Amino acid sequence: MAEDLQGGGAGGPQHPVPSASHSSFPEYELPELHTRVFHVGSFGELWRGRLGAQDLSLSEPQAAEQPTDGGASNDGFEDAAVASDLGCSLEAAAELRVVCGLDKLRCLGEDEDPEVIPENTDLVTLCVRKGLLDYREENITIDRACRQEIFAYEMESHALGKKPENPADMIEEGECILSVNILYPVIFNKHKEHKPYQTMLVLGSQKLTELRDSICCVSDLQIGGEFSNAPDQAPEHISKDLYKSAFFYFEGTFYNDRRYPECRDLSRTIIEWSESHDRGYGKFQTARMEDFTFNDLHIKLGFPYLYCHQGDCEHVVVITDIRLVHHDDCLDRTLYPLLTKKHWLWTRKCFVCKMYTARWVTNNDTFAPEDPCFFCDVCFRMLHYDSEGNKLGEFLAYPYVDPGTFN
């Protein structure tokens, strides 16, 4: 039976869609929210059995040949069709064919710079663009919105169509690709309703541990200890080296990372809590993360799952899409999981110079106007130590890892 869940939109409660007879295909359980449970590997097999070799091929499609004779008659038919669709005259359709024809699609010469706008251009769009660029240059305007758009575009398109140098790293035809959204840790209330922190593409044949290793979280880089008496002492470990335990939760199963001897079963406390109080969640199962691929999973598209690491750093994980690989995708399997989107984070600046990113945070600091207070490395040492490196005053100092460093 489908759960009696309530929709989050203005249309009121969502009603479950009647179930079909199989679970190998993603069908909606609640409209516009999430699908029913289906098996990822069976979904891929179903489509590979339906599609032909040409549909699954990853080779570039051949360009259609241009007709060598009868071109005039074909142009006449095309002009008539365009005139009918656009509601214009045959003369206007013929002019459009001449101006917008394929022979007009030419590349720039080797000595021409595409970034330079010519002075004698007649295009209004280029004139407007040139005026904006000249205005920014004169007024030293920083277009942060444009910078973020460029960052997002480059992140999404940097690997499109990329092929591996080693043919052995080529993705197989018919491989499944899943889109995975990684949200901010639950403890960050200000990002509770925000867009995903990271969006990744993973292959169906990849193990869960490969996604686990590719997720970047600032809590993995934290450095434990207080360093006010020895700021030059290099930290021995970061949190990711000390606390290697983690798990994914998908459809009643906790997939624990047990690759290292020091890994613990973080799900045991949750399972014991559920069973001892008869919470009504049913019987949970556990498995080793390194033994399962995404093709082995039963999932719902659009349903919130869980990734937990560092003991209590919890990220909501949503699988938003599943499809077969296309020849325009990145075909180098060594680049997967492939990061395609990332939220831009503002860095925390030093309280003193307001220029550089904070590297230290202090508590109970007699030299600071607030508690806690953030400093870059230069300002921290100039304010808290003498020329010989001796500590001045009383304070507690901790290394600070700014989330903006992931930009």
UniProtKB/Swiss-Prot annotation:
Part of the SNAPc complex composed of 5 subunits: SNAPC1, SNAPC2, SNAPC3, SNAPC4 and SNAPC5. SNAPC3 interacts with SNAPC1. The gene is Snapc3. The modification Phosphoserine is found at residue 42. Belongs to the SNAPC3/SRD2 family. PANTHER family: SNRNA-ACTIVATING PROTEIN COMPLEX SUBUNIT 3 (PTHR13421:SF16). Residues 1-12 have a biased composition (Gly residues). It comes from Mus musculus. The keyword Transcription regulation applies. GO terms for cellular component: nuclear body; nucleolus. Residues 1-25, 58-78 are annotated as: Disordered. Its main location: nucleus. GO terms for molecular function: DNA binding. The lineage of its organism: Eukaryota, Metazoa, Chordata, Craniata, Vertebrata. It is found in: Nucleus. Part of the SNAPc complex required for the transcription of both RNA polymerase II and III small-nuclear RNA genes. Binds to the proximal sequence element (PSE), a non-TATA-box basal promoter element common to these 2 types of genes. Recruits TBP and BRF2 to the U6 snRNA TATA box. It comes from the Eukaryota. This is snRNA-activating protein complex subunit 3. The keyword Nucleus applies. Keywords: DNA-binding, Nucleus, Phosphoprotein, Transcription, Transcription regulation.
